[in-house]
Regions:
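Outer membrane beta-barrel
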Residues: 1-88, 112-123
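Outer-membrane beta-barrel "beta-signal"
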Residues: 220-222, 246-260
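Hydrophobic, lipid-facing positions within transmembrane beta-strands of outer-membrane proteins
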Residues: 27-29, 34, 62-66, 75, ...
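Short beta-strand segments enriched in hydrophobic/aromatic residues
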Residues: 1, 12-14, 72, 81-83, ...
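Sequence/structural signature of outer-membrane beta-barrel proteins
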Residues: 13-19, 43-54, 82-104, 122, ...
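C-terminal structured domain segments
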Residues: 211-240
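Detector for outer-membrane/organellar transmembrane beta-barrel domains
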Residues: 106-215
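Repeated loop/turn-to-beta-strand initiation elements of outer-membrane beta-barrel proteins
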Residues: 5-6, 34-38, 74-79, 119-126, ...
Length: 260
């Protein structure tokens, strides 16, 4: 159109654990016109590093939003107003970690802004969001650089206090190196350090407990449209084992993914 490309999208996602636990939900549903996008969509916080080790967002990274993005090719900038209507999730570090403070009910509002650029073999973006109900915000930077046989990724995140966008820790640094071993095989070792993981009743970060994690993600293209992914991660949380999420643990998954 004279206002730019017009696009509508509806995505459905189904899950079946057993005969009595199954269902299909709307994954995304939005309209785009030029740089304007409105509807139910993933936020920019969903776009973290490519591997499966990092924890760079909190709570639900999807909801109703009104977004505008200006894209000049090697540079882009965007602003988004988001409805923060989902409940508060458990910590992504460990479900045993008790989050202090509290969130109010649904229909809260958040504001996000992002800028990004590409400089030769390097791409980078800086994302900032503010939770108007919690009166706290978070900033996250991600940089990718093509180095040798793979791509190096580095990210840092900081939060002023507990908020909908990021409340896993007061700050964190994550790095990965995605090695393109063959046309079909990519191996991505990664590590992350999270500083000050506890939240006080006033929603401020408190204490001196930290956590770190390391792992590897393996992606293999079996054939056109069929991929396999295997991820294994090790994590260590400060404190007395078994108390408030402290101790070490191993996690992982195996996934077959069909694309059309």
């Amino acid at each position: 159109t004279e206002l730019g490309a017009l696009r509508g999208y509806i995505g459905l996602r189904g899950q079946a654990n057993n005969d009595s636990s199954r269902g299909v939900n709307v994954d995304q549903a939005f309209i785009e016109l030029g740089g304007l996008k409105v509807g139910y969509m993933y936020t920019w916080w969903d776009d973290d590093l490519s591997g499966e080790t990092d924890i760079l967002s909190s709570n639900t990274t999807r909801g109703n939003a009104l977004r505008y993005t200006y894209d000049a090719g090697s540079f882009y900038a965007g602003i988004s107003v988001e409805e923060l209507d989902a409940g508060r999730d458990v910590s992504n570090i460990s479900a045993e970690i008790t989050k202090g403070g509290s969130f109010e009910g649904p229909n809260n509002v958040g504001v996000s802004g992002i800028i990004g650029a590409k400089f030769g073999a390097v791409t980078a973006n800086l994302l900032g969001s503010y939770d108007t109900d919690q009166e706290n915000g978070a900033i996250r930077a991600i940089v990718y650089a093509d180095i040798g046989p793979g791509t190096f990724g580095l990210s840092g995140v900081w939060a002023s206090g507990a908020n909908y966008y990021y409340e896993e820790s007061e700050w964190a640094v994550a790095a990965e190196y995605a090695i393109k071993a063959t046309d079909k095989l990519t191996i991505t070792p990664a590590a992350q350090y999270l500083g000050t993981i506890d939240i006080a009743p006033d929603n401020d970060f408190t204490g001196d407990r930290d956590a770190w994690r390391a792992g590897v993600t393996v992606d293999y293209k079996i054939t056109q449209g069929l991929d396999a992914k295997v991820a294994v991660n090790y994590q260590d949380v400060d404190g007395t084992d078994g108390v408030n999420g402290a101790g070490d643990s191993w996690t992982g998954f195996v996934r077959l993914q069909r694309t059309f």
